[in-house]
Amino acid sequence: MGHFHLSNFIALIGILLVGPTATSGAAVSVVSQADSNDICSKYVVQAGETCSAIAQAHSITTADIETYNAQSWAWTGCGQISQGDFICLSSGESPMPVALPHAVCGPQVPGTARPNTWSKLGSLNPCPANQCCSSSGLCGTTPDFCTSAAHVPVALSMSTDTQPNQLTTTSQAITISTSPAIPLQKVVTSSETSSSMTTSTSATTSVPTTTSTTTTTKTTSTLKTTTTSTISSQTKTKTSTSTSTTKPKIVKPWSLTMYTKQDCKGDYYVLQGHNKGYSDTCLNLHGGLSSKDTDTGVSCKWFTNDGKSSTKCDSGALTRPQSWIVETGICTVFSVKDCKHDLHSNAYTPVPKHPCQNRGKFDTPYFVSMNCYTEG
C-alpha cells in the first residue's frame, strides 16, 4: 500500500508541474515581430476593422497599437483608422505610408524613398512656396490643405523660439518641415560645389614645370591603356553572358477576382498581372484589357456559366461586385476611370484566413479602375 500511495503522489506532482505549462503554452499565440531591418510588422487595415478587432486577432492590445504607431505618418489615433492604411502591429521603425497614384507632394508620392532620418518624412516632395500638402498628397492654399491631418511624426524636435510658417536662415530651419527649408539647402549645396570647382581649377593652374606636364602625359597614356583593357574585358564578359542567357524568372502573379454575388459566387472577372513593385500604370476594367494569358503582362477575363465560358472583360456589365478575392498583391480600387483620386478609393490585400471578402458599407462603390502590383 505504501508503494501505491507513493506512485500516486509522484503522478500528482507530475500533473501539477507539467499540466499548467502545457495548457498555458497552447493558449499563447505568436506575436508579430519587427523584420531584419527593424521595420515594424506592417498590417493593411481592411474594411470596417477597428483597433480592438485587429489587436485581438494578433494577441496585442489597443494600447499597444497606439504606442507602436505614435510616429506613423498621419496617425490620429485608433478612432480614425481607414481601410488601406499601413499600421504597425509590433515595435520597430514605422513603415513608409502607402503610395497614392495621384499624390504630388509628401511621402506618399509613388517611388519616394525612405528618408535616412524619419523626422524628415514631412519635408519630402514639398509643395511650391505658399502652398500646403494635404493628407491625400495634393497641394493647395485653402484650410482643407493647410489644416490637414498629415503631419510630421511627434518625435520631431523643434526649437521653441521658432514659430510655424515663419522663414528663417538659421541651421535650425532644417528640423522644421516647411517648404522654404528645402531651397535653402539647395543653395548651400550649390555654393559648396562651386567652391570645390574653384579650388580644383586653382590646383591645376599651379602646376609649374615642363617635367610635370610630361609626367601627366605618361600617366594619361597609361590610363588609356588600362581603360581599353577594361572595356575589352567587359565586352567579352557581356558576350559570354548573352550566350548563356536563360528566360527571365517568372513572377508569381497578383490577381483580383470580382463576383456578382456575395460569398464569391456567380459570374466573375479575373484580373491578373506580373508587375513587381509599385508603378503608376492604371487598369480600366472596361478599357480594352487583353484576355490572353501571359507570364509577364496583364490579362482580364469575364467568366459566365459557372466559369465554363469566358471572354474579354469589356463584355461584362458588372461594375459593383458583391464579393472579391485578392491574391499575392495589393490593389487600389477607384470608382472613376484612369485611377483618378476620389473619396471612395480603397486598397485591398489578401486575407489568408478568409480569402473571400464580401461587400461592406465602407468599400469602394464601383470597381471602375485599379492600380495593382505584387511586392515580390
From Swiss-Prot:
UniProt-listed InterPro entries: Chitin-bd_1 (IPR001002), Chitin-binding_1_CS (IPR018371), Endochitinase-like_sf (IPR036861), LysM12-like (IPR053214), LysM_dom (IPR018392), LysM_dom_sf (IPR036779)
Start and end residues of each LysM domain: 41-89
Keywords, in A-Z order: Chitin-binding, Secreted, Signal, Virulence
Knockout or disruption consequences: Leads to enhanced fungal virulence, with faster decaying on infected fruits.
UniProt xrefs under SMART domains: LysM
Family matches, as CDD domains: ChtBD1, LysM
Protein localization: Secreted
The keyword Signal appears for this protein: yes
Gene Ontology molecular function: any one: chitin binding
Signal peptide coordinates: 1-25
Region ranges (Disordered): 190-219
Primary location class: secreted
The UniProt record lists the keyword Signal: yes
Disulfide bonds: none
Pfam family, one: Chitin_bind_1
GO cellular component, one term: extracellular region
Annotated domain remarks: The LysM (lysin motif) domains are small globular domains involved in binding chitin in eukaryotes. LysM9 contains one LysM domain.
Other notes: In plants, chitin acts as a microbe-associated molecular pattern (MAMP) that is recognized by lysin motif (LysM)-containing plant cell surface-localized pattern recognition receptors (PRRs) that activate a plethora of downstream immune responses.
Function: Secreted LysM effector that might have a role in sequestration of chitin oligosaccharides (breakdown products of fungal cell walls that are released during invasion and act as triggers of host immunity) to dampen host defense.
Family statement drawn from the similarity comment of this UniProt entry: Belongs to the secreted LysM effector family.
The protein's name: Secreted LysM effector LysM9
Source species: Penicillium expansum
Highest classification ranks of the organism: Eukaryota, Fungi, Dikarya, Ascomycota, Pezizomycotina
